Regions:
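Short helix/strand-bridging catalytic loops that position acidic/His residues to coordinate divalent metals
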Residues: 17-24, 57-61
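Membrane-proximal N-terminal amphipathic helix
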Residues: 21-49
Length: 152
């Protein structure tokens, strides 16, 4: 009798514990995506502002031929001086957060993300390596709400 009650309770508790664990990783994924995307946006805004300020100071029509996005995720951590427009390298992240749904936990965090370049097509799964315009999860898993993590 006691054994059957324990097995029923275990059968109820285990699935809800797994659901809570998955929900926590989903929350972490959303937070990490937001952190990286905000850093990319801040980089772009800083680049545009420094170019505009440099034009005003020097009276030059300096042309920014690039997209204004970072070349790699590492640039967000290591810092960038924007071609000398900034007195010292500006950093946008302390570290690159990991994708909590990466399949291999030994993979470095910066390699756990899929990346899109500004010139890539929206549905492209191959990074053009021109710059980093966006990041996404490489996971093929399905979220609790039925969407794919890679589409977040």
């Amino acid at each position: 009798m006691t054994l059957s009650i324990l097995s029923i309770l275990a059968g109820l508790i285990l699935p809800s514990a797994q659901l809570v664990s998955k929900r926590n990783r989903e929350i972490e994924l959303k937070r990490n995506l937001r952190t990286i995307r905000n850093a990319i946006d801040d980089y772009k805004k800083t680049n545009e502002k420094l170019i505009e300020d440099n034009k005003k100071i020097q009276g030059l029509a300096k042309d920014d031929t690039g997209s204004g996005y970072p070349k790699t995720l590492d640039v967000l951590v290591e810092g960038h001086d924007f071609g000398g427009l900034s007195k010292e390298p500006k950093k946008f992240l302390r570290r690159i957060p990991c994708d909590p749904f990466r399949s291999d936990k030994t993979t470095p965090c910066k390699e756990s993300w899929g990346m899109k370049s500004y010139v890539d097509k929206p549905d492209s799964t191959m990074w053009g390596q021109e710059d980093v315009y966006d990041v996404y999860s490489k996971s093929e898993d399905t979220a609790i709400d039925g969407t794919k993590y890679k589409d977040w």
